[in-house]
Amino acid sequence: MSLPRLCLGELINEDIHTWNSLCRQEITIKTYDNSIPISESSKKIRNQQYLTITFPKSSQPGGNKRLRPSEIQVTVPRHDKRNLDELQKPAHIWIRHSLRKKFQSPSINLIVRRQASFRHPYTHITHSKKAESKKYKDDKKETALKKISKKDTGPHEVDEKPKRRNKADKTPSKSSHGSQLSKKSKSKSETNPESKDSISVSIKHQKKEKRYSKDSKEMDFESTSTKKYSKSSKNNSDAVSETCSKNSSNVGLMVHLGESDAESMEFDMWLKNYSQNNSKKPTKKDAKKDAKGKGSDAESVDSKDAKKDKKGATKDTKKGAKKDTESTDAESGDSKDAKKGKKESKKDKKKDAKKDAASDAESGDSKDAKKDSKKGKKDSKKDNKKKDAKKDAESTDAESGDSKDAKKDSKKGKKDSKKDDKKKDAKKDAESTDAESGDSKNAKKDSKKGKKDDKKKDAKKDAVSTDADSESEGDAKKSKKDSKKDKKDLKKDDQKKPAMKSKESTETESDWESKKVKRDSKKDTKKTAKKATESSGAESDVSSKRYLKKTEMFKSSDAESEESLFKPGSKKRVDESDATSTDSKKDAVEPKRGIKMPSRRTTFKEKGKKIGTGRVPPSRERPPLPPCEPILPSPRVKRLCRCQMPPPPPKPRYAPLPEAKWIHKLL
């Protein structure tokens, strides 16, 4: 043999064992004689190495990769020693064996990995043990497949492998045929339900499903399970068809198909259990929704009934307000006539006095209307105090349209009067006309009294609530009117006092009027309080002689001081006769003794008791401050006594550690 042929044969054998290069499969290798000794071959290799070192060839892009000289020295003798038995066989046979070993082993590993990943993608927790056991079985079957493949291999050419793949595609095994049938059965069941193959396959699947679907009564779950099963069988058939193209052995494919069928059965079981568990849950949810819907319907019906009841209550309150406003409609007609005479009344003060008298007469009628409105309010306040008060106000506004027109005219008259005279004359005329128009809005007045007339008007409300009090006040008011008529002719020049009289009738008017009048009323009340204290000073001296007890004296004096503040007309009665004033005051004070008094009076009583002096009105709160100075030394005396006393033991919250020495000294 020539040297290049021997080198080529050795190099090709070396490449097959080391790198598994496919480039040199095309070269036809001829058998060489085994009679060549190793020493001659080694000499020839050395000569070749010398030539490669001295005359290096330029590396061509398409040329074969050459071995290093050190690798050639080491590997060639070893190869000859190992494969003495294999060299007896023809070269193409053992090359095919080596190639088959290398190319078949990774394909089987890939099949196992793909199937393992597809088998349990949905049950990592429940079927983990089964998956591990099946992997162990697959490993055993892989080793068996390798042994079978070694036995079945025979003498063939190198280029027969792609031919086998084509044959496997053209004439597949029974397992691949079954997978194709399952695919055809799907398409035929959807398109051609009359085909025999689809009927046979569907009957088999239905039988398997009926065995496991004894507990499930509804057919919807079976239809879903068949669909899912058909999808799983499709995936299994696809995976198996891929393995057919890669594997040449039919035995391994049959084993994999059997495993896939067993897994599909388990998958059906799991699907049915899952569907049954899910089918129970929505029924509960639907029941809850139905219950909620019924409850919401019942609540809506109840809310509608409650709304109807509220509307009925508001209608009743409106009817009660109508009755109250009927008495005020007659007065609203008189108020229009009074408005026409506004401009003429500015010049003549005698007409003002007559209108004040008429307004006082009308105020007596308005108080009767107040009583009726309060009775209707007590029933309405139980449900909603604020809402019913607003509704009563709205109902009175809607029904007394004439009174609203009267208000607008009165506002216009006020603006004209402010331009002409911004002083007290404008206030008199506005208050006298507003008193007449204000009678038609008793519901508004009563609803807004408690909010803005806090402490001053509580006593009036309590007095009006009782019938006996109202009668006693009615007698007192009649005496007031008689005294007022006599004094109006004497005091026409005084402009402040008629304003005070007109304010008595307009104390319970609307809010925007009361805000303007408050500032003037405070100044007038201070003046009246001073005069009342002068008269009360004389009364207190007489009462101190008659009554020895201080408690009764303070109660009567405080009640009288309140009346002097709220009712400035009382000072005039005192000037006339002390006996009549004391009798009228006692009648009003007796029912009020049982009623709670404001907090300011109680604190003032305590100060008065300590001082021991007579009654002091709230306008003179500053003078009682100096007597508080003798009270100061009493705590100083106590402090001196505390200094003389020994120090108290330490409190438990400030107690230090028990190891401290000063604690033992104190103890």
Curated annotation (Swiss-Prot):
Residues 129-172, 187-197, 284-326, 345-371, 380-394, 417-431, 438-464, 483-506, 521-533, 549-558, 583-593 have a biased composition (Basic and acidic residues). Residues 287-569 are annotated as: 9 X approximate tandem repeats. InterPro entries: CYLC, Cylicin_N. Residues 238-251 have a biased composition (Polar residues). Its main location: cytoplasm. Residues 173-182, 223-237 have a biased composition (Low complexity). Residues 121-251, 275-634 are annotated as: Disordered. Residues 624-633 have a biased composition (Pro residues). GO terms for molecular function: structural constituent of cytoskeleton. Coiled coil: none annotated. Sequence repeats lie at residues 287-305, 306-337, 338-368, 369-405, 406-442, 443-475, 476-516, 517-547, 548-569. It is found in: Cytoplasm, Cytoskeleton, Perinuclear theca, Calyx; Cytoplasm, Cytoskeleton, Perinuclear theca. GO terms for biological process: acrosome assembly; spermatogenesis. Keywords: Cytoplasm, Cytoskeleton, Developmental protein, Differentiation, Repeat, Spermatogenesis. Disulfide bonds: none annotated. Testis. One of its GO terms (cellular component) is sperm head. PANTHER family: CYCLICIN (PTHR16742), CYLICIN-1 (PTHR16742:SF1). Interacts with proteins of spermatozoa head including ACTL7A, CCIN, FAM209A and SPACA1; the interactions may be necessary for proper acrosome attachment to the nuclear envelope. Plays a role in the establishment of normal sperm morphology during spermatogenesis and is required for acrosome attachment to the nuclear envelope. This is Cylicin-1. It comes from Bos taurus.
